[in-house]
Regions:
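Aromatic-lined carbohydrate-binding surfaces of glycoside hydrolases
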Residues: 1-81, 95-100
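Hydrophobic, Leu/Ile/Phe/Ala-enriched alpha-helical segments that form helix-helix packing faces
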Residues: 50, 78-82, 196, 219-222
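Flexible, acidic glycine-rich loops studded with aromatic residues
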Residues: 99-104, 109-255
Length: 255
């Protein structure tokens, strides 16, 4: 579970700056007021409750898209709170600008942070793994701020792990434009299959043409499982469903 510290901080308006309750989609402007000592009591309480109700070993403190002169101090304290609960901290890559503990796991989304501490890494580079982005150029109801033409199946599969500290990969899907289970399937599949093969394969053992050939053999299986996957045009699917559930959102020239 992730507690978004501290950019997405409107969950408690009294501790946020500015105090207006925000209910739209834009990000990058709200933050916890780090001058207030009560902030740490609040964060400790919420993280403590999260630790009690979850069985996993990790708590995610967020920490991206914020600029504050006390940011590094806050991140170090938040990391300490998580470790005090017997959990391992995960944070977006910006948290490694601070002298956090070396056990913290950095989740990279753009790879541009100048880290001052050597930590394990989860690769979630947006140009390969942000699956709220379009499957192909022009797909409606998708984001494109990281990669204008979308994050293709090939973008996902051809990602190369270059850092020896990498312990895994993860593909986030933000759901402000995912309004149904079918839409979620469209975002996840088949790109998640490509991501899985990235996670368990050495780069030299990957071959995209071979992958899409093997992938096509699972079309009928996915249909029978009622998975509303995006029917990537370059894959020769072995099923009769000619179009994906969201084909109406795709340029006709792509088919």
């Amino acid at each position: 579970p992730e507690l978004n510290c501290d950019e997405f901080a409107n969950i408690e308006p009294r501790l946020a700056t500015p105090p207006q309750l925000f209910h739209e989609y834009t990000v990058g402007w709200s933050k916890l007021c780090l001058d207030k000592p009560e902030i740490y009591d609040f964060v400790a309480t919420v993280l403590g409750e999260m630790a009690e109700i979850t069985t996993g070993d990790y708590l995610h403190i967020g920490g991206d898209e914020i600029e504050d002169e006390r940011y590094k101090e806050f991140v170090v304290k938040a990391d300490s709170i998580v470790r005090g609960l017997g959990k391992t901290t995960i944070g977006w890559e910006e948290v490694t600008q601070a002298q956090v503990d070396s056990t913290l796991i950095s989740q990279r989304w753009n790879g541009k942070t100048n880290s001052v501490v050597n930590t394990p890494i989860i690769e979630s580079i947006c140009s390969s793994f942000y699956y709220d982005h379009a499957n192909i150029p022009g797909q409606e109801m998708t984001n494109n701020w990281c990669k204008e033409d979308g994050v293709s199946l090939k973008d996902a599969y051809t990602f190369k792990v270059k850092n020896p500290n990498t312990i895994g990969v993860e593909a986030p899907v933000w759901t402000e434009m995912v309004l149904s289970n079918e839409a979620a399937d469209d975002r996840f599949w088949p790109r998640t299959i490509a991501m899985a093969e990235v996670g368990w394969s050495e780069d030299e053992n990957k071959d995209y043409k071979n992958f899409i050939k093997r992938l096509g053999e699972h079309g009928l299986r996915l249909d029978l499982m009622d998975v509303h996957y995006f029917r990537t045009p370059e894959v020769e699917w072995n099923s009769d469903r000619n179009k994906g559930v969201f084909s109406e959102y795709m340029p006709e020239s792509r088919w």
